[in-house]
């Protein structure tokens, strides 16, 4: 069974919380499909090239059909010529890939389970830095001692945001923004208990 590490108000180890046993049976392919879809959706479909039907000019036949011994030329807009249209060039393609709700939920479960198995899923009752000082936020992350950390809160208040925003390799999201990709890509996850309960219940 996968276990998340519970931290007390001083961010010290204070026990464990067990994730549902069903999480162990989920296939990693669900996470692969979700990450592939998520990254594809970030692609900007701005690449565009004109075809021979769209470039300007070329209304006149450039040379006689017969007599020169060369190949037949019907238009200067052909992809064969400089200034002509492009054959099979990029169009404004839609890169989005569909992933159904069940696969999204399974991907999230798998990502949480993987972090727990690695000893990198940390649960805290509430994460608030009342002073808004980065020094205190750094002290919190030093207790976790991981290369980079995703912080998931129910609601991020202004002071806590100010404390964490300038720290390298640290990213904060609220519950509605978290997804399987973010959980999987960071080396550790610090999550509020209410959010973890909600995610495991929804998933």
Curated annotation (Swiss-Prot):
One of the primary rRNA binding proteins, this protein initially binds near the 5'-end of the 23S rRNA. It is important during the early stages of 50S assembly. It makes multiple contacts with different domains of the 23S rRNA in the assembled 50S subunit and ribosome. Forms part of the polypeptide exit tunnel. This is Large ribosomal subunit protein uL4. Residues 50-74 are annotated as: Disordered. One of its GO terms (cellular component) is ribosome. Keywords: Ribonucleoprotein, Ribosomal protein, RNA-binding, rRNA-binding. NCBIfam families: rplD_bact (TIGR03953). The keyword Ribosomal protein applies. SUPFAM superfamilies: Ribosomal protein L4. One of its GO terms (molecular function) is structural constituent of ribosome. Belongs to the universal ribosomal protein uL4 family. The gene is rplD. Gene3D superfamilies: 3.40.1370.10. The keyword Cell inner membrane does not apply. InterPro entries: Ribosomal_uL4 (IPR002136), Ribosomal_uL4-like (IPR013005), Ribosomal_uL4_dom_sf (IPR023574). GO terms for biological process: translation. It comes from the Bacteria. It comes from Aliarcobacter butzleri (strain RM4018). Part of the 50S ribosomal subunit.
């Amino acid at each position: 069974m996968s276990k998340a590490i519970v931290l007390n108000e001083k961010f010290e180890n204070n026990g464990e919380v067990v994730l549902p046993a069903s999480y162990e049976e989920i296939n990693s392919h669900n996470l692969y499909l979700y990450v592939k879809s998520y990254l594809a959706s970030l692609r900007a479909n701005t690449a565009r090239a004109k075809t021979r039907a769209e470039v300007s000019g070329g209304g006149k036949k450039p040379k006689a059909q017969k007599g020169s011994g060369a190949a037949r030329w019907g238009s200067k807009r052909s992809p064969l010529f400089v200034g002509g249209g492009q054959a099979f060039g990029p169009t404004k393609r839609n890169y989005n890939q569909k992933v159904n709700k069940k696969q999204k939920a399974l991907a999230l479960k798998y990502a949480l389970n993987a972090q727990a198995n690695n000893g990198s899923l940390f649960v805290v009752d509430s994460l608030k830095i009342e002073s808004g000082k980065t020094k205190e936020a750094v002290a919190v992350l030093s207790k976790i001692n991981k290369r980079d950390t995703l912080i998931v809160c129910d609601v991020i208040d202004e002071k806590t945001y100010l404390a964490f925003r300038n720290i390298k390799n640290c990213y904060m999201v609220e519950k509605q923004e978290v997804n399987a990709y973010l959980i999987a890509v960071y080396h550790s996850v610090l999550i509020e208990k209410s959010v973890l309960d909600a995610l495991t219940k929804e998933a």
